[in-house]
């Protein structure tokens, strides 16, 4: 969060893309890293780093394309990641 001159906190801008657009970006630019992480509300989020960009891109919802999509189950987040990266086999690294 960033603090504005007026003293009010604002959320940092997040780069989000819908699944179809993100799939095309990964296909063209190449996948560097895909991360599934959990926040304090126990929601899972999917983020992708593309090889030609150093920016992290989050999977967005269909109805609100600028909001990161929150998954309630890890299996659903993994399935969405497999659809984005067009792979069947995924290696999990737990931290």
Protein language model regions, located:
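Short N-terminal micro-motifs specific to bacterial/archaeal maturation
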Residues: 13, 67-68
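A short, charged, amphipathic alpha-helix used as a generic interaction element across diverse proteins
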Residues: 70-85
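Short aromatic-glycine-(Arg/Gly/Cys) micro-motifs in beta-strand/loop hairpins
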Residues: 37-66, 84-87, 95
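Generic low-complexity, intrinsically disordered sequence content enriched
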Residues: 26-29, 63, 78
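Short N-terminal "domain-start" leader segments
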Residues: 1-54
